[in-house]
Amino acid sequence: MKALRFKRNIPRYAAAKIAGNIMPGSGASFGPIDLIQGESPEAPGKDWVKVRPRLSGICGSDLATVDGKSARYFEPLVSFPFTPGHEVVGNLDDDSRVVLEPVLSCTSRNISPPCTPCGAGNIGNCENVTLGEISSGIQTGSCHDTGGGCATEFYAHPSQLHSVPDEFSDEAAVMVEPTACGIHAALAAEIPNDGVVAVLGSGTLGQVTISALRHFTNPKTIISTARYPEQKILAAQLGSDIVVSPEEILRSVRRVCGTKAIANVSEKSPDGRVDRLTGGADVVIDCVGSSKSISDALSITKPNGRIVLVGMPATVELELTPLWHRELQLIGAYTYGTEKLPDGETISTFDLAFELVKTAKLEQLVSACYSLNDYQEALKHAANAGSRGAFKIVFDLRDERERNIK
């Protein structure tokens, strides 16, 4: 077996953080992640099945780990060493193709009765991520026992697997999991009919969120921010009515919503600098998760509006007075589970994701494929995808020479 392996190594983690601050993605060259070759792993339990990845996507959470930027909040929720990778399309032993739903819920941990969230179908909120028959881990790709998608093989519980329709390409299938995240965020936003929604960030997560908003909700206007030309073009194609640079978002929301602006007068800006609005968008979905993006969201959301944080944040510094003064709702949108559609129907997020990937042709977001041997270059490409005109970067393990290392 060949696999990427992330170990607990504080000095190398610190080195990765320094390198990642200099050049995003370069933590792969200095941090505690290595390409290893070894014996095939043992199944974590009798019901678990072996999956041989075909494509495995690189997620923003993977990049945060590689560059030493992931929150220490997760330390007790993972088990070392682990193999990253949770955006996976692969083959079972009978060669049928499956997509992984990576959350390690009560069902996969053989815990009965399930916790309240799992019992309600909200497996992303499982309360037992450190318990049961397998080691700690919120998802495949953070659990020592299961392995992960950045390998020639790993194990999954049958409850985690979804069959891939024959008409789906591998590139379409590998987009199902990230698309499910965008759908969950779009539906969690509870956008009023004919409301105004702003999406901050137009990387992969921003793009699938825009697509989900257009297909499953009914906003009057979608405004999105994009930094690079390719992002702007695709955001418009997938359903954004207005695409602006991050620096123009306040002005754009002001124009669309017809709200007033407030100037902040200071010694550095004696004539005043507009940095907030009296009104704003009904909902803002933050697909970045930085101090700047959350601060922008607080500035452009109308009083009693809602901010949905879907981009994974780390440690941020924020002025939270607007949250209090404007009585805003700030909620997180993590993974997926069971969704409630505007018409009251309940349905699996992954069922919706298969539908949306097909309808919106989201396989177009897959920009480049790399072998595991080239993992350092792949991670650097993924970390700088926007500036290089790319979106989703994946590992390609379809070549049998990749799967059968002598």
Language model segments and positions:
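Glycine-rich helix-loop-beta junction characteristic of Rossmann-like nucleotide cofactor-binding loops
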Residues: 187-192, 215, 276, 299-300
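Adenosine-nucleotide cofactor-binding segment
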Residues: 199-202, 207, 214-292
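Glycine-rich phosphate-binding loop and adjacent beta-alpha segment
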Residues: 236, 291-355, 396-406
